[in-house]
Amino acid sequence: MTDFHRIKRLPPYVFEQVNRIKAAARARGADIIDLGMGNPDLDAPRHVIEKLVETAGKPRTDRYSASKGIAGLRRAQAGYYQRRFGVSLNPDT
């Protein structure tokens, strides 16, 4: 197997370190709500799951939103493109 020398220079995976810290805290009896990596360790409430199932079965719920987004954010993005790339964008289209 090839030894990739660049891999050895990478820092340790942060969530590996966090997992060790959490495990040690739990071993000491700490009550931890794990929100690491966006993966809660509690199940979703039953009523939330039921509403998701109900909504997923409705026609046209599998489309993107028609929302144009936040007007201030669109203006900021257009301004960034103008400053950075010299490109003029209309934030309303």
From Swiss-Prot:
The protein's assembly and partners: Homodimer.
Species: Methylorubrum extorquens
GO cellular component: cytoplasm
Swiss-Prot/TrEMBL catalytic activity: L-aspartate + 2-oxoglutarate = oxaloacetate + L-glutamate
A GO MF label: L-aspartate:2-oxoglutarate aminotransferase activity
Name under which the protein is recorded: Putative aspartate aminotransferase
EC numbers: 2.6.1.1
Localization in the cell: Cytoplasm
Cofactor(s), by name: pyridoxal 5'-phosphate
Keywords carried by this UniProt record: Aminotransferase, Cytoplasm, Pyridoxal phosphate, Transferase
InterPro entries, alphabetized: LL-DAP_aminotransferase, PyrdxlP-dep_Trfase, PyrdxlP-dep_Trfase_major, PyrdxlP-dep_Trfase_small
Family: Belongs to the class-I pyridoxal-phosphate-dependent aminotransferase family.
Top class in the EC scheme: transferase
